[in-house]
UniProtKB/Swiss-Prot annotation:
Region (Interaction with tRNA): 152-154, 315-316
Gene it is expressed from: mnmA
GO cellular component: cytoplasm
Organism, as annotated: Lactococcus lactis subsp. cremoris (strain SK11)
Key words, A-Z: ATP-binding, Cytoplasm, Disulfide bond, Nucleotide-binding, RNA-binding, Transferase, tRNA processing, tRNA-binding
Principal location class: cytoplasm
Gene3D superfamilies cross-referenced by the UniProt entry: Adenine nucleotide alpha hydrolases-like domains, HUPs, Translation factors
Region described as Interaction with target base in tRNA: 100-102
CDD domains noted in UniProt: MnmA_TRMU-like
Protein name: tRNA-specific 2-thiouridylase MnmA
Residue pairs linked by disulfide bridges in the UniProt entry: 105-202
Record function comment: Catalyzes the 2-thiolation of uridine at the wobble position (U34) of tRNA, leading to the formation of s(2)U34.
Site keyed Interaction with tRNA: positions: 130, 347
UniProt-annotated binding residues for ATP: 14-21, 40, 129
Length: 376
């Protein structure tokens, strides 16, 4: 933290119209900071009923900001979001991968475009309603730690943040659990106290995903096969399926198979537009022993090349897995202590040392005993 008093410290809060960012602004205001609220409009968003949800959310931001007595603004990042997040999102699906737009949205919008805008407003820091914590050493190095609420910890989605971004960031909810945040909002009578949490893609909301994706990418139906060549039917388009997916295959326990075990997606072949499926949650082709990832980013300074035993998550809310990482510039090979199920290219692999999030990378390919998985 700077040597300034709270009253001399300007904090620009990213306010979404939800309860978390509302309480973030409230707590900072109560702590005496010079708080400004900013609503980011990143998507031209109309829901299934024709209601522009961004307009409704902005009204909630205005109501809360008025209640707690802070100025507020709206800023339009639709172009930045389209260029830096949505184009990436579509390119990943075209390549048969399953992207994580929330990771990219934090990296490119909330902690880049928004951070730059906040600095123009004279900010010393930005703050968001993420469940994560920061700790600063005497030498100024910032460590990003998991949020106190294990169910809500969001360091997975913040794993691409750099040291420079973290030095300018505050996470006032990091030490709180979600029920306590709700209680604070209710006690203060905030307009958003009872508003339900948003789900769905970062800034795109709760649209019908298949229909939404189909508006931007033409679907290419193809064959659904087992790994030993038995045709099981047709798929609607490889982009609609992810490794380990069970629902939406429409094959049940059919085709004269010996068991009634459910079917899962075990691979995709873009060259032949084939979706591979296998029977059983523990199908051997769902398990990998290592992966390669790129776009590696650490939350603090690290050597150019090194090996480290630590833990990792391969998806949000997953238990940590012991791994050994082999780092070379912005690429990393990750060897697992135990085989891991349903490693998904396009998703983030995020590294931890105890409570500290060290950073992460985007998964390119998984292997089983050096044999490439998922992409035949």
């Amino acid at each position: 933290m700077s040597g300034k008093s709270p009253a001399q410290t300007r904090v620009v809060v990213g306010m979404s119209g939800g309860v978390d960012s509302s309480v973030t602004a409230l707590l900072l205001k109560e702590q005496g900071y010079d708080v400004i609220g900013v609503f980011m409009k990143n998507w031209d968003d109309t829901d299934e009923n024709g209601v522009c949800t961004a307009t409704e959310d902005y009204k909630d931001v205005a109501a809360v900001a008025d209640q707690i007595g802070v100025p507020y603004y709206s800023v339009n990042f639709e172009k930045e979001y389209w260029d830096r997040v949505f184009e990436y999102f579509l390119a990943e699906y075209r390549a048969g991968r399953t992207p994580n737009p929330d990771v990219m949205c934090n990296k490119e919008i909330k902690f880049k475009a928004f951070l730059d805008y906040a600095m123009e407003l004279g900010a010393d820091y930005v703050a968001t309603g993420h469940y994560a914590q920061v700790r600063t050493d005497e030498d100024g190095t910032v460590h990003m730690l998991r949020g106190a609420d294990n169910n809500k910890d969001q360091t997975y989605f913040l794993s691409q943040l750099t040291q420079e971004q973290l030095k300018k960031t505050m996470f006032p909810l990091g030490h709180l659990e979600k029920p306590e945040v709700r209680r604070i909002a209710e006690k203060a009578g905030l307009a958003t106290a009872k508003k339900k949490d948003s789900t769905g893609i970062c800034f795109i909301g709760e649209k019908n995903f298949k229909k939404f994706l189909g508006e931007y990418l033409p679907a290419q139906p193809g064959k659904m096969m087992t790994l030993d060549g038995v045709e099981m039917g047709n798929h609607a388009g490889l982009m609609y399926y992810t490794i380990g997916q069970r629902g939406g295959l429409g094959i049940g326990g059919q085709h004269g198979q010996l068991t009634s075990d459910p079917w899962f997606v075990v691979g995709k072949d873009l060259t032949t537009n084939t979706l591979y499926v296998g029977q059983g949650f523990h199908h051997e082709h769902l398990y990998s022993t290592s992966l390669d990832a790129s776009d590696l980013s650490f939350t603090r300074e690290m050597p150019e090349t090194f090996d480290l035993h630590c833990t990792a998550k391969f998806r949000y809310r997953q238990e940590d897995t012991g791994v050994t990482i082999h780092v070379k510039a912005d690429k990393v090979t990750v060897d697992f202590d135990e085989p891991v199920r349903a490693i998904t290219p396009g998703q983030a692999v995020v590294f931890y040392d105890g409570e500290e999030c060290l950073g992460g990378a985007m998964i390119d390919v998984a292997y089983k005993e050096q044999k490439v998985m998922q992409y035949q």
